[in-house]
A protein has these predicted regions:
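A glycine-rich phosphate-binding loop feature that marks nucleotide/adenosyl-phosphate handling sites
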Residues: 132, 170-177, 317-330, 350
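A hydrophobic, small-residue-rich beta->alpha segment in the mid-to-C-terminal subdomain
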Residues: 268-311
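Small-residue-enriched alpha-helical segments and adjacent helix-cap loops
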Residues: 6, 28-32, 56-208, 214, ...
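Iron-sulfur cluster-binding cysteine motifs and their immediate structural context
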Residues: 87, 210-233, 237-261
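Short glycine-/aliphatic-rich beta-strand segments at the starts of folded cytosolic domains
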Residues: 17-66, 128-135, 278-285
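Acidic/polar, glycine-rich intrinsically disordered N-terminal extensions of enzymes
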Residues: 1-48, 288-290, 302-305, 322-331
Length: 360
């Protein structure tokens, strides 16, 4: 292909855009040559380059779902103090990048006054809670993830603006059992307690092969109802995840009378110490009590308090539980231990303690 033909081609429009052109000038200048960073205070980091350049990072907790008016306020602050450079973290924190030390305090005051947001979330603190769409946008929410995050962060506000925990704590909330919020130290998920109810009239407009294929445990199969093609659920196989409802709204699994919330703990993605780990059930059957979810807030605060007093420095929540044993964890929290806490999946043997070292 000639040079002229290459110039006529449209710019690439797939994949991630080139991030280099959006970096702060100091980040671009010292790319790959950073020496160390220092903690100035909770929410403020000082990054020092080999060249001696210093870049300050101010982290503020955002509500994630924002109006265009709020976005313009963020941009105005960034234009005034950060040469127009900000970035969002994976947990919806906003990080303002500052090259001049004298602009740090004025920026913090502007964030707290104009946006009403707290500065924090670094080091051994509670980071912003990651959550799924909830009632705002998701097509199968059993609860409002965004609303529960607001209620929960009101209760845990001081842990965001101070570093008084043994190690960082990450919380996620998911509006359904599929757990789009991902692995976290503490995760709040919806629990359904019965298989989906099939509406034979409405299910006819759904693509049956897709609905059958999306079930992770092969609990859905074709059937006939009133002489027409339909679907049926095998109750013995169904694990009440609700994935089928996303493919076919006529397979309704949500139930305001029976749906509850559960709390899972010990998940992490970091490779430190024992490496990444999945979450395990801590407490289930909590009422889906909108709009403040007080029972969930009390349970989460109880977990954080026993972790705060019992864990060693730099020990993540799941690592602390593994060290003291789950029996001791249930004693400290007062949560009831039930048969539903025991992993009875067919491949559960890989997760069970098979050594002779048992804490009694």
């Amino acid at each position: 292909m000639s040079v002229q033909e290459q110039k006529k081609k449209a710019p690439r429009d797939n994949g991630a855009p080139d991030h280099m052109k959006n970096l702060h000038p100091l980040m671009l200048k010292n790319y790959g040559k950073w020496k160390h960073y220092e903690k100035v205070r909770t929410g403020v980091l000082k990054r020092v380059a080999e060249s001696g350049d210093v870049l300050y990072v101010v982290r503020a907790g955002s509500p994630r779902t924002m109006s265009i008016i709020t976005m313009r306020k963020i941009c105005d602050i960034a234009d005034k103090y950060c040469q127009g450079h900000i970035r969002f973290t994976s947990r919806a924190n906003v990080e303002f990048l500052i090259g001049n030390e004298k602009d740090v305090e004025p920026l913090i005051k502007a964030v707290e006054k104009d946006l009403g947001w707290p500065v924090g979330g670094t080091g051994a603190s509670l980071s912003n809670i990651i959550h799924t769409q909830g009632w705002l946008h998701c097509n199968l929410p059993g609860t409002d993830a965004a609303g529960s995050v607001k209620a929960l962060m009101d209760e845990l506000f001081n842990d965001f603006i101070t570093e008084n925990l043994p190690q960082r704590v990450k919380i996620s909330t998911s509006c359904c059992s599929i757990n789009c919020g991902g692995q976290a130290d503490i995760a709040i998920n919806v629990q359904h307690h019965h298989p989906p109810r099939v509406d034979n009239k409405g299910v006819g407009v759904c693509e049956h092969p897709k609905v059958v294929a999306i079930c992770p445990v092969a609990a859905i199969r074709p059937s006939m109802a009133d002489g027409k093609a339909s679907l049926e659920v095998v109750p013995e196989k169904c694990m009440y995840c609700g994935a089928c409802h996303g493919q076919c709204p006529s397979m309704e699994i949500r139930d305001a009378q029976t749906d509850t919330l559960s709390i899972w703990i010990g998940g992490k993605a970091a490779s430190t110490r024992k490496g990444p780990s999945f979450m395990k059930l801590a407490v289930w059957g909590l009422p889906n009590n909108a709009p403040r979810w007080p029972e969930v807030g009390e349970a989460v605060k109880k977990i954080i308090e026993v972790y705060r007093t019992g864990a060693r420095p730099y020990e993540r929540l799941g690592e602390w539980v593994e060290r003291i044993g789950w029996k001791r964890f249930f004693e400290l929290t007062g949560f009831p231990f039930t048969k539903y806490h025991i992993d009875d999946f067919k491949n559960a043997r890989a997760t069970l303690n098979t050594s002779s070292h048992v804490r009694l």
